[in-house]
UniProtKB/Swiss-Prot annotation:
List of residues that carry N-acetylserine: S2
SUPFAM superfamilies with a match to the protein in the record: HSP20-like chaperones
Major site of localization recorded for this protein: membrane
Function: May be a component of myofibrils where it acts as a stabilizer.
Organism: Halocynthia roretzi (Sea squirt)
Protein known as: Body wall muscle protein HR-29
InterPro entries per record: A-crystallin/Hsp20_dom (IPR002068), Alpha-crystallin/sHSP_animal (IPR001436), HSP20-like_chaperone (IPR008978)
Swiss-Prot/TrEMBL Sequence repeat ranges: 37-55, 56-74, 75-93
UniProt-listed GO biological process terms: negative regulation of apoptotic process; protein refolding; response to heat
Molecular function terms from GO: unfolded protein binding
Recorded topology in the membrane: Peripheral membrane protein
Stretch list, region 3 X 19 AA approximate tandem repeats: 37-93
Gene3D superfamilies assigned to the protein according to its UniProt record, in alphabetical order: 2.60.40.790
Amino acid sequence: MSLMPFDDFYYPYQLRRRSPRWMDSTGSPWDSFATSRDWMTTPYSSTGIGRRDLSQDWMTTPYTPAGVGRRDLSQDWMTTPYTSKGIGSRNLSSWGSKSETIREMEKKFDELVRKVDRRFTGMLSMLDDPEPFARQNISVEHEGKTTSKTTKLQDFNMKVDVQDFKPEEVKVKVQGGQVLVHAKRENRDEGDGMFAYSCSEFKRAFILPEGVSAERLTSSLSRDGILQIDAPVAVAIDNKKTAVPVTVEHTK
């Protein structure tokens, strides 16, 4: 409720009127007879209505329950949670359970960030490394190499470490003379008001050697997460020399 200015008021229990003098000999804008019009625009003093020493900086100093005036700011009450019992410090033990929940959420989030960083770092290193299979966690063993010095072909055999994936998450297919290996895992975690999502994906493509039967290619996954891919030779090239008789004609 706002105060409306008026010329007369009782304080305390006596009729007082405004003095015709605005400034007295002491320089005070107030005398013993004052109206509400004046005290509404004049700083209030804890000792009564009248001029007060502004050196206390009470208008810029936090209020104390004991009265208006300077207080010890060392209590840091402005940065301390307010309590219904009064202004001042409070017991923060009630925040313990909530703080524990927040710390647990931060721990899960940090763990998720580390997993993503490891996956992302591995992908970047595979792009920079000309021979990634010899240095990455996902190892590949490839057999069935051919050389130009011999025409004898060997069966196609390949091993890939996919132990981070479940069997239903690994797919192998043949397309355009290549063996394509694709594995993908998605994790969703919901709890304590937090939602987390992570994705791990692995892709590899291998060229089938000439003469290998893609239709007879097989793949199997062992218990320790090793993917075995085999393809037999379809056509064997005979490198034996064949003698061609030469007929010599004699002309007379």
